[in-house]
Amino acid sequence: HIDAETMTLHHDKHHATYVANANAALEKHPEIGEDLEALLSDVDALPADIRQALINNGGGHLNHALFWELLSPEKTEISAELAADIDETFGSFDAFKEAFTTAATTRFGSGWAFLVVNPKGKLEVISTANQDTPITQGLKPILAL
């Protein structure tokens, strides 16, 4: 359970600030476009003067956007395909939950736990510091906390 005050703080303050700061960085180099996923998939190609701002704030925006997208007031079931992939990778859904919980609760300081798809199409649980997004590592996040 996450309380309403924490959710409001993350939505109205943190996420809004990441969006504003990412947009401010992008305004300095309109020639690179605005597709944050594409830009963050090759951070070395970013202009040096905005690279860290986009890593921090673009990552913060993408991480929060995925988190909000996945929230639902109703309990939902995962797809049969994802359930099978989880069983294949982790052995069981309970083992996945344990791995994900460990990733979320053992991060020192601020950060995220993710279920990602790696370039080989396999699932992994990872943890990133601060607002680092798995996209910079060539991973596709499908669950974020």
Swiss-Prot record:
What lineage, starting at the top, does this entry show? Bacteria, Bacillati, Bacillota, Bacilli, Lactobacillales
Q: Any idea which positions bind Mn(2+)?
A: 10, 64
| InterPro entries assigned to the protein according to its UniProt record, in alphabetical order | Mn/Fe_SOD, Mn/Fe_SOD_C, Mn/Fe_SOD_N, Mn/Fe_SOD_N_sf, SOD_C_sf
Q: How is the cofactor bound?
A: Binds 1 Mn(2+) or Fe(3+) ion per subunit.
> Can the keyword Iron be found in this entry's annotation?
yes
Q: Which family does it belong to?
A: Belongs to the iron/manganese superoxide dismutase family.
Q: Which EC class is this protein assigned?
A: oxidoreductase
UniProt keyword Transit peptide, yes or no: no
Listed GO MF terms? metal ion binding; superoxide dismutase activity
The GO cellular component terms are: cytoplasm
Q: Which UniProt keywords apply?
A: Iron, Manganese, Metal-binding, Oxidoreductase
Cofactor names from the entry are:
Mn(2+); Fe(3+)
Q: Which domain of life is it from?
A: Bacteria
Q: What SUPFAM superfamilies does the annotation carry? A: Fe,Mn superoxide dismutase (SOD), C-terminal domain (SSF54719), Fe,Mn superoxide dismutase (SOD), N-terminal domain (SSF46609)
What residues does Fe(3+) bind to?
10, 64
Q: Which reaction does it catalyse?
A: 2 superoxide + 2 H(+) = H2O2 + O2
Q: Which cysteines are joined by disulfide bonds?
A: none
Q: What is the designated name of this protein?
A: Superoxide dismutase [Mn/Fe]
Function of the molecule: Destroys superoxide anion radicals which are normally produced within the cells and which are toxic to biological systems. Catalyzes the dismutation of superoxide anion radicals into O2 and H2O2 by successive reduction and oxidation of the transition metal ion at the active site.
